[in-house]
Regions:
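Conserved helicase/translocase motor-coupling segment
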Residues: 1-31
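Generic detector of well-ordered alpha-helical packing
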Residues: 5-7, 60, 163
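Conserved active-site and cofactor/substrate-binding residues in soluble primary-metabolism enzymes
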Residues: 9, 39, 161
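Active-site-proximal flexible loops/turns
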Residues: 11, 66, 172
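Mg2+-dependent endonuclease catalytic cores in nucleic-acid-processing enzymes, primarily RNase H-like
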Residues: 20-152
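Short, flexible active-site recognition loops that position polar ligands and cofactors
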Residues: 152-160
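Acidic two-metal-ion nuclease catalytic site recognized across multiple nuclease folds
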Residues: 171-185
Length: 185
């Protein structure tokens, strides 16, 4: 699951995926404008339960939503302390994040890598994404209008850019090898 929480005038994007039949299949993709914070927290929790979500990647620019979601599922809310504890024990950030169900993602650091990863999944071997066009038209529109400017998404040119960001976050779960196998964590 990938979540781009709303702040300012942006929308709240949610994308849920699963690996089935050799493809990343979209189970849920929606964008909400000016949503109620509590309603979004409840919706995300319900989607996590309904789809038995293993990992939730959330834009780290909204720490209050991340902490609220972590509290709701019984995970340590102060994720900065968790990461610091792993560091003090000689483990890296990756070990701490691997043990988390709700994972904060620093878009400033990772946006280019996530865009490249997204392009690779969409383009390699004819694409590895299955999207129902009758259910997820906003996601399809966002993918069709996405513009890559030297590894950075041109948000002005991209329709539904918040659902696109949630899609990129959801794809962090998948790691492909040359043999078409998918490893996920």
């Amino acid at each position: 699951m990938g979540i781009d929480p709303a702040y300012g005038s942006s929308a709240f994007g949610i994308v849920v995926t699963e690996w089935a039949d050799g493809l990343v299949q979209i189970l849920y993709a929606e964008e909400y404008h000016r949503p109620d914070y509590s309603e979004m927290l409840s919706l995300v929790y319900d989607l996590m339960s309904k789809y038995q979500v293993d990992k939730v990647y959330v834009d780290g620019a909204n720490p209050s939503f991340i902490k609220s979601l972590k509290l709701q599922i019984g995970e340590e809310a102060d994720y900065d302390k968790v990461i610091a504890r792993y560091r003090s024990e000689g483990y890296g950030d990756d070990a701490a994040l691997k043990d988390m169900k709700v994972v904060p993602v620093n878009f400033n650091k990772e946006h280019k890598a996530m865009l490249g990863h997204c392009k690779m999944i969409l383009e390699n071997e004819g694409g590895r994404i299955a999207i129902n066009p009758d259910r997820f038209d906003k996601l399809i529109t966002s993918l069709r209008t996405a513009v890559d400017n030297d590894g950075t998404l041109d948000k002005e040119s991209t329709s539904y850019n918040d659902i696109f960001d949630a899609f990129r976050l959801a794809l962090k779960f998948y790691h492909f090898q040359e043999s078409s196998d998918c490893n996920s964590y």
